[in-house]
Regions:
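Hydrophobic alpha-helical transmembrane segments
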Residues: 80-94, 176-185
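Alpha-helical transmembrane segments of integral membrane proteins
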Residues: 12, 16, 20, 106-111, ...
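Interfacial helix-loop-helix junctions of multi-pass membrane proteins
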Residues: 127-137, 168-172, 206-233
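Aromatic-anchored segments of alpha-helical transmembrane domains
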Residues: 26-30, 116-124, 203-214
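Membrane-interface loops
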Residues: 39-48, 98-197, 241-260, 272, ...
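Hydrophobic alpha-helical segments of polytopic membrane proteins
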Residues: 199, 209, 228-244
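Alpha-helical transmembrane spans of integral membrane proteins, capturing the lipid-embedded, hydrophobic core
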Residues: 17-29, 87, 91, 112, ...
Length: 300
């Protein structure tokens, strides 16, 4: 893997991460131009998914959608969940890994980036209309129904009012919400110290899957495809890590992706030398016991 600049502990500096994230955002925005010219194809794919899921007895979205519409409090909470956590939890986990678990940051970051690239390719090659945009399919657009309760507009999913043009309405396959949620849950469940935090991490991916389907933003197969995209991203990152590790050993340098052997192991390797140097400079007092004579005993 290529890093333009690194800190002394092997992590890329913050500005490199910021440039990368901004670049991916504009790449996602560019997919809208491709999707806008494929509305009939996107609707056709949506209907195909409905028929395929019916044959597989996987059409759970409509029932969840109608059930959620009957509970306004839960529907509004689901709208806020969909419109916020996707954009808050994922960056928060990235920052937490960068600051608190630096030895695992690079591999985790490359995993989610690879999964995002795979998803972007899916958006371009297979524009898919979400259930809420299928006319006559019996779905209710939950976000539009409760748009007065939030900042999102009635004509878009989670985009703020007046900014619907920035959202790709036909980026349903795969579900990036579910891919990112599973990544967050896996990272936090694996590396967090507190049990209650790990419990929330385990619940988060499943809750996200429920929300995206109940609000009629994704199909069951979208959710599965999002999880598969994350799995492929993890496999690709692992493969590149192994190749980079072999090259690093051959060239006599550290693995540029897997930085778990960074400052901590370096400190562990340097510790014996430090102990030897300290022992040489300050020999233990026990070596001079035979040279000292006991002083006079004073009784008080």
């Amino acid at each position: 893997m290529i890093c333009l600049r690194r800190r002394s502990d092997g992590l890329p500096v913050v500005w490199v991460e910021a440039v990368m994230i901004i670049g991916f955002y504009y790449t996602y925005t560019a997919t809208r131009a491709v999707a806008d010219g494929s509305v009939p194809a996107a609707l056709a794919v949506g209907w195909d998914l409905v028929r395929i899921q019916a044959d597989l007895h996987l059409n759970a979205e409509r029932g969840l959608n109608h059930w959620l519409q009957g509970i306004p409090v839960l529907a509004v909470a689901s709208c806020y969940y969909y419109a916020t956590l996707h954009f808050i939890v994922t960056p928060a986990v990235l920052v937490w890994l960068y600051r608190k678990r630096p030895g695992h940051y690079l591999r985790a970051r490359w995993t989610i980036l690879c999964a995002t690239v795979i998803s972007l390719v899916g958006f371009i090659l297979l524009p898919t209309a979400p259930p809420r945009l299928l006319p006559g399919a019996g779905f209710v657009d939950t976000m539009a129904s409760f748009h007065d309760w939030g900042w999102w507009g009635g004509g878009s999913s989670a985009a703020p009012r007046g900014l619907a043009g920035l959202a790709n309405q036909f980026a349903a396959m795969p579900s990036l919400h579910c891919a990112w949620a599973l990544w967050c849950g896996w990272c936090v469940a694996r590396f967090a110290r507190h049990r209650w935090v790990r419990t929330l991490a385990v619940i988060y991916p499943g809750t996200t899957a429920f929300v995206v389907m109940a609000t009629a933003n994704h199909y069951v197969l979208d959710v599965v495809a999002g999880w598969v995209a994350l799995g492929l991203g993890a496999l690709l990152t692992a493969a590149v890590t192994r190749v980079a590790h072999r090259r690093g050993r051959r060239d006599g340098r550290a693995d540029p992706v897997d930085q778990r052997a960074g400052p901590q192991r370096a400190g562990q390797q340097a510790q014996p030398a430090a102990i030897v140097g300290t022992a040489a400079a300050h020999p233990p007092a026990s070596t001079n016991i035979h040279r000292t004579r006991p002083g006079p005993t004073r009784c008080m």
